[in-house]
């Protein structure tokens, strides 16, 4: 009536025989192969049922067995499958259905667990063998190799194709004049202006001889010979295209060589035939001091003509200049870059009829951006001029230290340029009438440098002397110190000292320059201390001496400083005060190396030696005849000097 209850205690399970089924793993097995086997799910155990449903066959992979045992057991796998049976307490195939169902469920669970476990153990077995192989290989490498420090891995030699090599950038920058037509001149090229009487208008020739000179300077001779006849001829044939026949002009000439007159004469000659005043000449200068000088030159050359010459300076009211330019258009407009940009922005002037663009002191103009003036001017050319073809404007670039940098000159878009320069391999030239002196001061006596300056001024005795210092602060300090030494009776001569500095008003600085230009009184030495502000283009007559109290920072700066004297073939002297061996070596390597001097001109000499020769007889009885007499200071002078310094410090 009731089904028999299943008693689990009566179930007797015979432990099945474990028959591992392994694959042979080669010694050089790689991890990728083992991973692939695992991914493919290597079938280690299989579960099968016979028709009676009571026999279940299971195979397991067991660690620890040898490969020979595995092979023998795998061969008898089929025979042992039938022997692996579960004895259900002696029950036969006629047992109850509930007991059979329960038994089948238990067998299925055991089969799944066995399969998963066998795969896990298989994976561990493969990993152990791979790790053993890697350790063995690593050990062999360590035994064979020698331990050494970290070193750079040897690299193969770089194979370079010389055809593809790019030139050094520094070399490319200094090739501005490679494709430029060159005209060389020398100091012997001088003529009488009377020889150009056929090429110059009578008024212009008369003004030249009246206000300037009856003979030319070398750079003037070179330019007038090259362009005067060409200008006159092309103006008669085609006024529109004469600029292309001339081309652009680059001039590298020493200071005081007559550059201003060299470009002013051809310009005035060209405009002498004009009938209506239109802006045809634009002259750009770096400072307002140069503006006054160029304006004076142009006005003197144009005397007796109807040419309108206008200047524009920052000190003038912009609104007044704007109204004046709109009312009367000038023939020649002289200005600075900053004010020029202002007028172009406000349409005060038009460049439609422009024929000449002059850059005086061009190296300074190109080195400084000045409100990005070059792109502004070039852009205005394109918008104003009807003739957009290259060469519609003659660009005239003048400087004593003309740059050779292609990057700077490229913005000017030069057309068929011609370079005028002396036949020298060096960058800059000095006037042949300039005598240079090297004044060497020992480093141990550098504190006496102001006293040596005063001693040098005593030897110069009279005339105008320009003293260059490094900064505005140095100018102020040196002025106070020199005046204190003079008041302290460190000299018996009459020396007047002034300085150009930012503490003075503009009007005060102009007054000082004006007073300095006047003739000195007899037995009086006028000294003007200044920075490099006055080293460019300022033409003050009869400056006898230039003293470089502070060494200039470049050969370019040195040329401009020395150019304030020995102008217009007059004699001049430059004194370089060099402290210690360092400054002397710097002057030799960085300044003197770039400077060319005329073969028949003056050469630098030691002032210490020349002083000893002059004053040697006075000190013939000294116990040290070979000592430097100029730098020798007695104890009384030293004490007096130190006392003055002490008093200045306390103030």
Swiss-Prot record:
Listed EC numbers: 3.6.4.13
Q: Where is this motif: Q motif?
A: 216-224
Question: Could you tell me where this protein is found in the cell?
Answer: Nucleus, Nucleolus
Q: Name the CDD domains for this protein.
A: DEADc_DDX51 (cd17956), SF2_C_DEAD (cd18787)
Annotated segments matching region Disordered? 1-114
Indicate, by first and last residue, each region the UniProt record lists as having compositional bias (Acidic residues).
27-42, 69-85
What top-level branch of life does the organism fall under?
Eukaryota
Biased composition (Polar residues) is annotated at 49-60
Entry keywords, A to Z: ATP-binding, Helicase, Hydrolase, Nucleotide-binding, Nucleus, Ribosome biogenesis, RNA-binding, rRNA processing
Its primary localisation, in coarse terms, equals nucleus
The record's catalysed reaction(s) read: ATP + H2O = ADP + phosphate + H(+)
| GO MF annotation list | ATP binding; ATP hydrolysis activity; RNA binding; RNA helicase activity
Q: What GO cellular component is one of the record's annotations?
A: nucleolus
Cite the record's Basic and acidic residues compositional bias ranges.
7-17, 100-113
Top-tier EC class: hydrolase
| Recorded family membership | Belongs to the DEAD box helicase family. DDX51/DBP6 subfamily.
- Say what the protein does: ATP-binding RNA helicase involved in the biogenesis of 60S ribosomal subunits and is required for the normal formation of 25S and 5.8S rRNAs.
Tell me, how does this one assemble?
Answer: Associated with pre-ribosomal particles.
* Record's protein name: ATP-dependent RNA helicase DBP6
